[in-house]
Every structure is written in structure tokens, then in C-alpha cells.
Amino acid sequence: AQANLTTSLTNFSEGETIYEVMTGKTAQLPVLEVNEKLHLVPASLTLAMVDVELSTAMARESILKDVLERANVSGNYDFVLLDCPPSLGLMTLNAFTASTDIIIPLVSEVLPFKGLTMINDFISMVHNKLNPNAHISGVLITRWEGSKLSKGIELKLREALGDTVFKVKIRKNIRLAEAPLENKNIVD
């Protein structure tokens, strides 16, 4: 609901987004070509309203799955990444219902680490009731620094989850945070 990928990867400012498709305002899934190998369905801040707008919709947890199936997304792409908001609301429920492999990005800090159990329980519920193909394929440590805190969180994650924690970590990088301010996408 924050549209961070759209902001970070494109100069998109106007036009239809995933919000209009999910709320039935348009049928065609809008796709932007970021580069030859990366396409993006844009989002905007209006996506934050989708939880309210779809709160009474029938089968609201599978709207995104239906949208992606109608657009034959799995037939047209090798990988589809669904960037979820940092909450367990309707958008995240829709993404998990439409997914098979779920990667959990986890900031190497104490509070996100403590929330991992709730995310795991949420995915288990989706797996048991809505999508038997949904499972955690890995945990990706993000904003990692060589600090005692980051190392401690990584150690605890590896003790608790073993090989589910990816070996690769995304280091904290101020240039990534500055890129949208300078109107640069992070791919270039």
C-alpha cells in the first residue's frame, strides 16, 4: 500500500494501478516495462484504501489471485514478485493466497524478529484454509550491518530457522534510501 517499488523503479505518476483492477474499476492489468527483463504492475498510495473498499466483497481474499489468473501472469513470466505492505491486512492476505513461495524480508532488528512468529502463523492459516501451495521458501535478512545487533539477530534466526534463512543478506545502504529523492531508480 506504500507503492515503494513503483516509486523506486519508475517515474510513474498517473494512470491505472493494481488498485483500479482489484476494485473492479478496470479489467486490464496495467504493466510497465522497467527494462527488458523487469516488468511492474504499478501501485499508488490509493492502494491503502483497498482494505476498506473490499471489506464486504465476496471472496475478497482471492481477488488478486483471480486478477493474476485472468491476465495469465504465470504463463507470461518466470517469476512474479508481490511486494506486500508491512502489515497482515487484506492486501497481504491476497498476496499469500495468490502465491506459492513466500520470501519474508526481515529487518535485522529486535521488533521485526519478534513479529516473525505472527507472520508464520498467518501463512500457516493461509496454507491450511485458502492456498495449500503457500509456504515460506526463505527469510531474507535486510538492512544488515556488521553491528552486534545485526549479528545477534542473524544468529538467533539461523538457530530458530536453519536453512530457511538465506545465506545472502541485504546490507544497509544509504544510496538505496536516497535514490527516490534524486528521482533515480535502484536498478540503474
Q: Can you annotate each of these PLM segments?
A:
Residues 1-188:
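P-loop NTP-binding core
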